């Protein structure tokens, strides 16, 4: 069973240019990491009309109740003009003790911290009562109708 470091995993997630609704391979990446902990996983794809499809991942560790479910998104808003950034927004940087990059504060670091915490918990509690289900998703933004 793999135990993950939250900062290292957050840096890896920031490298994915997951500007809504682009997946950029992050769901497959997360699936691989979760399977190393022992999760059963399923990537789900959703499409509404003419919109671009979005991918979500559902994973579950354990089969009993109660179930603890954590939901977090891994898409980011566009970075805008790259020239306005002091560093590449998809190249994680530590500056003055802070992690800088697209998704560092919303919410790739949170997803990374959850996975790291669960990996540590699962390594120490192989037969815990209940189950854990992280759900990671990208946002589906539908165009508004003009009036």
PLM region spans:
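Short, well-ordered, mixed-charge alpha-helical segments that flank or form enzyme active sites
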Residues: 78-79, 108, 140
């Amino acid at each position: 069973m793999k135990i993950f470091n939250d900062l290292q995993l957050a840096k890896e997630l920031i490298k994915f240019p997951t500007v809504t609704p682009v997946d950029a391979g992050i769901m497959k990446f997360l699936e691989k990491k979760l399977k190393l902990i022992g999760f059963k996983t399923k990537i789900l794809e959703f499409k509404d009309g003419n919109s671009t499809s979005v991918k979500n991942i559902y994973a579950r560790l354990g089969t009993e109740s109660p179930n603890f479910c954590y939901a977090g998104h891994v898409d980011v808003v566009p970075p805008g003009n790259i020239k306005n950034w002091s560093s590449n927004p998809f190249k994680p940087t530590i500056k003055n003790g802070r992690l800088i990059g697209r998704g560092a504060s919303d919410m790739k670091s949170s997803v990374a911290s959850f996975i790291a915490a669960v990996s540590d918990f699962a390594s120490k509690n192989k037969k815990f009562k209940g189950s854990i289900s992280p759900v990671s998703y990208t946002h589906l933004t539908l165009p508004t109708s003009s009036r």
